[in-house]
Amino acid sequence: MAKCQICGKGPASGKNVSHSNRRTNRWFRPNLQKVRVLREDGTVKRMWVCTDCLSAGKIKRYVSKSVEA
């Protein structure tokens, strides 16, 4: 779950900086979503994808056909 399986974006390290300018280490984690992706061969696979790739339309999301009662 640590990386986007489309673009490879992963956690980046940085610093928290307080008002008194003290610095502590922290992680900037990507916003990953577990989505069902429709692949080119017609199969469906669950993948961890960052929201940047989702909003850019880099993947085609699979939507199951719901049965109406």
UniProtKB/Swiss-Prot annotation:
InterPro entries: Bacterial_rp_bL28, Ribosomal_bL28, Ribosomal_bL28/bL31-like_sf, Ribosomal_bL28_bact-type, Ribosomal_bL28_sf. Keywords: Ribonucleoprotein, Ribosomal protein. The keyword GTP-binding does not apply. One of its GO terms (biological process) is translation. One of its GO terms (molecular function) is structural constituent of ribosome. One of its GO terms (cellular component) is ribonucleoprotein complex. Residues 1-21 are annotated as: Disordered. SUPFAM superfamilies: L28p-like. Pfam families: Ribosomal_L28. It comes from the Bacteria. Belongs to the bacterial ribosomal protein bL28 family. This is Large ribosomal subunit protein bL28. It comes from Thermosipho africanus (strain TCF52B). The lineage of its organism: Bacteria, Thermotogati, Thermotogota, Thermotogae, Thermotogales.
